[in-house]
Amino acid sequence: WVNKLVMGARIYDNLDSANSSTLCSWRTRGMRRVERNDILIFNYPNNDNRIAFKINYVYAKRCVALPGDSISAIDGYYKNSNYHEPLGNKRAQDYLNQVSEDRLDECIKYTIPYSYDTYPWNIRNFGPIYVPRKGDVILLDAETLLFYSKILEFETGKTFSTSSDGTVLADGEPIEYHIFTHDYYFTVGDNVMNSCDSRYWGFVPEEYIVGV
């Protein structure tokens, strides 16, 4: 069952929100914040390679990083910059630690940001990846765009690209920085070898979380 009271129940602003790709809602007062290792129920945020809301498309994954954390995997084990206790399913991570590189299925091997020449990461070794927090300021360049382009487009409604000299453009206009307006979470499945999760599609906006 899902406890919607932990974070506070999510209330839609109007009935149209339930049928829209844009979520308009607010929360009642909750009992506590999300904690690392909580299992979260949330609306799957990756639709057509962008963050968009689908009311009946719901995932259950474990939270391994909160807003303001940096998350990585080292030899198959999750590491969090602000939390030094075990994260996730240790037995599954033990298996990932031991499996040979050539046995990692190519379709699950590589993780965001999918730029292997720059970041030769895979599900056993990746990161650190910073999880955005509301109010954080990020300087924009080609590197940060690799990690946060979906968030930038979600928060601004603009299309982001880079010019030939590496300048970041928003709807064709130069932009130097961005202030995040939402909190985000990094979630993973306990079946680390076979889980569609934040390692592949990125961050979960707080507003998309249904409960714990």
Q: What residues fall within each predicted segment?
A:
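Soluble "head" domains of membrane/secretory-pathway proteins
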Residues: 1-212
